[in-house]
Amino acid sequence: MCFSVVLYLAIRAVVQLIFGPLSDLVGRRPLIIWSLVLFCISTVAIIFSQSAGQFFVLRVFPAVCATCMVLSRAIVRDTTDSGQAAGSRIAYVTMGMAIVPMVGPAMGGRLDSFVGWTAVWWALLYLGIAILVISFFDVGETMRTKSKSFSEQISTYPMLLRSKRFWAYCISSACASGAFFSYLGGAPFVGSEVFGIAPRELGIWVGIPAIGYVFGNFISGRFSMKIGNDIMVLLGVSISLFGVSMSLSLSVFGLGSAISFFGSVIVVGLGNGMTVPNSTAAMMSINQKVAGTAAGLGSSIMIGGGASLSAVANFILVPGSSEVPLLVLMWISVFVVLPAVLYAVYRGK
């Protein structure tokens, strides 16, 4: 099952590389609609799959719906006049998105326990259909100037990759998210093996830290326009670094507990809620004409890096491990954000 998740994330990263520039060519709306249609069809196929092999193959197709996550950010950038305004709106969008990882593990665990694994996919199908209907009637086209060809749009990748500020903001977003991906990769092991949390309760413990992410995005939504993207990213990474440092210190001195571990991740989530939307908005503001391409490339790097860190977390946590290796990995990931954003500020002067 872990293999299916890794495969899903890999396909998701590739999809975003393609669909980002494609959205700058054909527009945002068509890709969102067809991505949701494919998501619903592939979900039905997964429900009626007859073997593990079929499940693994079909599991990758819902990854195309990651397009909606990327394009929602591009749509926000299309409809705003500045990076600060985009950061504020992206924060509110992400705040709503954070509800899913907060309640998803607990709901999925209970559906699986009481009904069976297909119940999770039936729930996803109903949600997918509902979002498809809403998007069909409510999402308009926001792309102002479309590209002439897909090859022309792909050709903007080298320009973005040569931009030092793009890389600085991209690394900021990827490493901040990477700390959370590391947590997702290692938290089930730490919760069950280190702290002895029962499987029925584990989903709740793992999902609770998303509360911090919700509040962090709320703060970004309220203050990004007043303070600016760079200052918000600096404040966010400082808060995240404080949270993971406190938990790491307690664990090193033998004072770690489930409350200190999962509680610290709430603080990390609070900081990430300020870091990720503002670094993403700044990344897309480097050249607004290729906002979709920048969003796709940045998100692909973020997901790819996050999947790698999640795999590292699984690798370093072996039977008999404490929570310390995971906290060290999270600390390193968060710390890298600091020099990256400072460099972005320096290059922007």
Stretches found by the model and what they are:
Residues 280-320:
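A late C-terminal transmembrane helix in Major Facilitator Superfamily
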Residues 140-170:
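Juxtamembrane intracellular "pre-TM" segments in multi-pass secondary transporters
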Residues 13-52:
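Conserved MFS/SLC helix-loop-helix module at the cytosolic interface between two early adjacent transmembrane helices
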Residues 52, 58-99:
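Cytoplasmic helix-loop-helix junction between adjacent transmembrane helices
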Residues 54, 91-137:
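Helix-loop-helix hairpin linking two adjacent transmembrane segments in secondary transporters
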